[in-house]
């Protein structure tokens, strides 16, 4: 008896989970990305907004549009605000709405904080750091010179590909011949072919 009841519980739980997943899928199908005005500001962000059916859209325009016209707001902002209100009410537990709302608040905070400083301060972090190193009045200590030289050498090596010189090839092939004496014949053939291929373009 207890086994049957446990199975029935898991079946009913699975059915509930399936219903939740299907509802979430249906909700996701009705979403689209739109430019939305943030609150009363002129800031517009590109975020996920639920796609409203034409019947629901007309109802929301009539109800929200009347309230917005009383407050002397344009109708475009009213439809965007209606979509954002629907976003909050339709999907309170979804990650999409919480992320978009947090992004909306962050964008609004950034716009209010960053509206005046960029006009007064030029932003150029990279040249300032380079100028600081070149104009450094103190000479570097012995330890600093040693640390800087390997960095320069490694960057020079990374920029230039290694080049093979005929003198470098000859000792390598001699070593390969010595090493390949005990190797199987296939390996000997391959190494000989590689050395021939490398020598041909140089000569």
Swiss-Prot record:
Organism: Danio rerio (Zebrafish)
Pfam families recorded: BCL_N
InterPro entries per record: BCL7
Protein name: B-cell CLL/lymphoma 7 protein family member B-A
Region (Disordered): 55-80, 94-148
Coiled-coil residues: none
Domain of life: Eukaryota
Biased composition (Low complexity): 109-129
Family: Belongs to the BCL7 family.
